[in-house]
Amino acid sequence: MELEAIVLAGRANDGKLAGESEEPLEANIDIAGRPMVSYILDVLERMDQITKIHLIGPREGLSRYETGKVKILPPGGDLFDNVKRGLDAVSSEYALVCASDVPLITSEIMERFLSRCVESGADFCYPVCEKSQCDKAFPGVKRTYLTIREGTFTGGNLFFVRKAAVSQAWPMVEKMISYRKSPLKMAAQLGPWLLLKVALKRASVSELERRVERLIHLKPKALLGADPEIGVDVDKPSDLELCRRILGK
């Protein structure tokens, strides 16, 4: 399957990482001698099934990455505007949406993720990483986890969507994206009974998927057991230190 990718790279470096780098954009913060965003761009550029990459952010900070395959798209006002701009620019039936701060994702990891997405036949695929695997791969790294019947999980930093399905379900998708780092808030959108089951750690993935499908009329799929590297994004100094240590070896 051929598809286009969207990389979100417009965040200004005025948050938790401001003291770690003078770069105006977080995407350009140095990790092991390279700008952070270059890692995911290299992965996507090497993949034959990715026909175009829409890099969303200010041209003055990102023009160095523009190639025949990578096109710069001016940012909107916030995360949701940027995702919508990217989807509007995509001409393929499906799109891959990625953060720019995921330097540990490799070509092999991305190939596995996309293969599972295509096999699922779903309209919206979201990677879910098991806590035990994350703790084993990256001891001591703090993430937000949610415990359900199948285990304890955290969400990843990319997703796979069928453009037409997401466009018609955008209001709920927007909420889900905004709550991507708060699994409990995400679950709260699914109704009080299911929220209670989540609180009691008795909800199952299939129940959550069925509820989402009824709410927004698209077929979702949570991909359990995603590679732990997908769950590592650089949004605080300890994450930056971890990635510099791993990639600097």
Which residues fall in each region the model found?
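Conserved N-terminal catalytic core of the sugar/cofactor nucleotidyltransferase
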Residues: L3-V7, R34-Y94, S107, K201-A203
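Short, conserved phosphate/pyrophosphate- and ester-handling motifs at nucleotide-, phospho-/glycolipid
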Residues: K236
